[in-house]
Amino acid sequence: MASPTLALAQSPPPKSPAVSVSQRNPHCWSKLPLDLMQLVFERLAFLDFERAKSVCSSWQFGSKQSKPNNQIPWMILFPTDKNYCLLFNPEDKEKLYKTQHLGDDFAKSIVLATYRSWLLMQPRYEELEDQTLDQEFHLYIKDLLTCERINLPAFESDIFGLSHPILWIDDKTKDYLVIGTINRETMVSFKNGDNSWKKFPELPKSSCTDMCLNMIYKDHKLHYLDYSNLYIYDFFGEFPREAFRISVREFVGYATNPYGYDEFPEVPLKLKLNRYIYNMIVTVRGDVLIVASLHFSMAETWEFIICKMDSSKVNKWEEIVSLGDESILLGLGITVLAKDMEGITCNSIYFTADDFYEDYEENEIFIYNLDTNKVEIPHQFVSSSIPSAHARWFLPTFKRD
């Protein structure tokens, strides 16, 4: 489809209609060749794409052969106990879009991961029939715009299902890959064509001191982070193969303030670290970053430390204070180019606390500007009016009709 089947959930009062481009100049724009028109449409973001469709009937027809070139992160909100999502586009802050009905079991599920417009869904723990150890979990993948669904085979887990989840899918071929851990020592994957979940034979074993902190998958490589090392595994063969590792003890130990623990009662409360998250990022240019997100007691917002890997130096990690013309989508493990692009804040971190087992808090999904060290909550009008169970940033993919 040329744009998602979305209904407006909220919008401002209608304004007086403006004179359209076709009324001002009825001959020039309507007679563009279709191939040239498609070149125009393929360069438009969602909002401009929707505006261009209304220029004239020939542009309306041309839009059906194209799709928006969306590079702007949107926000998904999951209203409590509802079988649909709400989508917020920062480029058009006055509107909120509602998806189609996403299935009777959608409200009873949690989203583990996203890839473009695809969601990796798992039943809520309280919805399981038998809440015991070695519980069986049935996951599925859902396109929130087309409602296409892919069911995955069941697996048993002695924790709350799939942890450190990764979803990757090719929109054209529908090839997909799901990765995660099902206990402290076992990592599994499933891809199209498999009959069951496969265990990884060579990945590092977690322990109390070296448990997995974060995983991301990009360009057929799995990046795995624990308290000691960052590992990179190639996924070009039948089984993953370790291609690279680098110590992270210097950075991880530095960023995680020990004052967060009770054995330091003399430390003022405001200096105690009560929560931290580590994320790996692969930038547009291919650099590998680690972002430490830190929340101190009595602090109004989170703090961030960013380090860049440089394996050519003795000191392998270098702290950086600017992303230049890029912005980080923390939960997706990537950066996007943001310079001169309306709707996205340059040199910023698009942050989500990303804990689907905790209650949703509207102040834990925001945009952190590294230039000003200030937080922007662009969706505040939404959060105040619609109770939500969860929210996260994503990059939607729009399809042709």
Swiss-Prot record:
Residues 27-74 form the F-box domain. Residues 1-23 are annotated as: Disordered. Disulfide bonds: none annotated. Pfam families: Beta-prop_KIB1-4 (PF03478), F-box (PF00646). This is F-box protein At1g69090. It comes from Arabidopsis thaliana (Mouse-ear cress).
